Structures are given as structure tokens and as C-alpha cells.
């Protein structure tokens, strides 16, 4: 069982960043060495901070150097929210908000890239047992953002050009309650019991692994 102190130690690595309060003698170079990251990432995550004039007591975001989006773990609504938060810290030009709430009150989070007039919308995890589309979309988001800051390309087109031309909206988990049911995060309680009652009418579909609908049994 993971206790509160263990979670507190793990959380920065799940979100991909930590924070640091500036002390006398701190520099971005020194902080990069201290946290095993690089100066570029620290500068990018703190766009309003002058690295030549660090103010004692200022709180800095310190992104780690590893890729944030895991692709070899089962996903949940919480993990998705942590990754969205981490991406917006690492790449502060990204915008994030919620388009609404799920049946169980979870935020339906989205990311916005770009400044263009042409609007494009991608989403993932409509069907609960197709949650694998969530890390696919989040990995795309991470690669796009990294390509933008490093002058790279996406599909043969400069990411900076795509950023200027399009406003891209990504909603990585349309059905968070259903995903939590399928991946085992939701395994008891009233919502779980009602979902099981619905599933009993379809014995040919394994429960919860085969569940596609939202937690109320409505196919999205």
C-alpha cells in the first residue's frame, strides 16, 4: 500500500516536474545539474523569469529530462490529468481547461496548441475499453510540443508552421469514468454496482474489460 509520504515522493515523477525555491547562489546551470535536467527545459518552463537575475524566494518549475507520457501502463482519469498538468508546465504555450464534467464529476480536460484560424479537434477514449488511444494522443501532444520548441517537424511540416496555421484541440479522455472502470481504478461502490447490473444483461461481454459505455451505460 502506497502511503501519503510515498505518493508525495512519486508525484513529481508522474507529473514530470518539481518546484524549487530560489536560494542564494542558485543559477539555472546549477539547478539543471542538481535535478539532472537541462537549462533549456528550465528556461522554457519559466518564461517570465530572468535567468541572469534570479530573485531569492521565487518558485521555479523544474521539468525533468525524461519523456512524460508513458505508453506501457494502464491509464486512468487521474494519470491523464497529471500528464496534462505536466505538459502545460513543461510547455507553457499550451493552454488547458475543461469542456465539462463526466457523470461522476471528473473534468473533461483538453489541450490547445497553436494560434491559427483553422480549428482542428482530436479526441480519444470515447469507448472505455479503448483507453489505449489516450496515451497515443498524449504522446502526439508531447512530440508536437517538443518539435515546436526545437524547430522540428511533424509529418514533414515544420511544427512552427502548424502552430501558426492551426488551433489544435486535443481531448485525451472523453470517457474517464468508463476508463477507470475498465482499468480497475473503480472497483466498488454505487456506480460500479449499477454498471455491473447493466453488464449482467450482456453475459457475452466480459466485465469490466469489455465495457465501452460511460458509467451510466450510455454509449458515447
Which functions belong to the PLM regions below?
Residues 109-117, 125:
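Short beta-strand-to-loop junctions in surface cap/lid or active-site-entrance loops
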Residues 117-118, 131-220:
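Active-site/substrate-binding loop(s) of hydrolase catalytic cores
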Residues 12-36, 58, 64-67:
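Primarily a LysM-type cell-wall glycan-binding module
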Residues 43-50:
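Short acidic beta-strand-loop surface patches of small beta-rich interaction domains
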Residues 22, 121-124:
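Short hydrophobic beta-strand that contains or immediately precedes a catalytic carboxylate
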Amino acid at each position: 500500500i502506497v502511503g501519503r509520504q510515498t505518493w508525495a515522493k512519486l508525484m513529481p515523477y508522474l507529473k514530470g516536474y518539481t518546484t524549487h525555491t530560489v536560494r542564494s547562489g542558485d543559477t539555472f546551470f546549477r539547478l539543471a545539474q542538481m535535478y539532472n535536467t537541462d537549462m533549456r527545459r528550465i528556461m522554457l518552463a519559466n518564461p517570465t523569469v530572468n535567468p541572469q537575475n534570479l530573485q531569492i524566494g521565487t518558485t521555479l518549475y523544474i521539468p525533468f529530462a525524461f519523456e512524460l507520457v508513458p505508453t506501457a501502463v494502464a491509464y486512468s482519469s487521474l494519470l491523464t490529468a497529471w500528464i496534462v498538468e505536466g505538459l502545460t508546465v513543461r510547455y507553457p504555450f499550451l493552454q488547458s481547461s475543461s469542456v465539462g464534467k463526466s457523470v461522476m464529476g471528473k473534468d473533461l480536460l483538453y489541450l490547445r496548441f497553436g494560434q491559427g484560424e483553422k480549428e482542428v479537434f482530436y479526441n480519444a477514449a470515447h469507448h472505455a475499453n479503448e483507453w489505449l488511444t489516450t496515451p497515443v494522443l498524449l504522446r502526439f501532444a508531447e512530440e508536437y510540443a517538443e518539435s515546436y520548441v526545437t524547430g522540428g517537424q511533424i509529418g514533414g511540416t515544420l511544427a512552427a508552421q502548424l502552430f501558426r496555421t492551426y488551433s489544435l484541440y486535443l481531448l485525451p479522455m472523453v470517457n474517464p469514468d468508463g476508463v477507470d472502470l475498465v482499468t480497475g481504478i473503480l472497483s466498488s461502490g454505487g456506480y460500479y454496482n449499477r454498471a455491473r447490473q447493466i453488464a449482467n444483461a450482456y453475459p457475452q461481454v466480459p466485465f469490466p474489460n469489455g465495457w465501452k459505455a460511460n458509467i451510466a451505460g450510455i454509449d458515447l
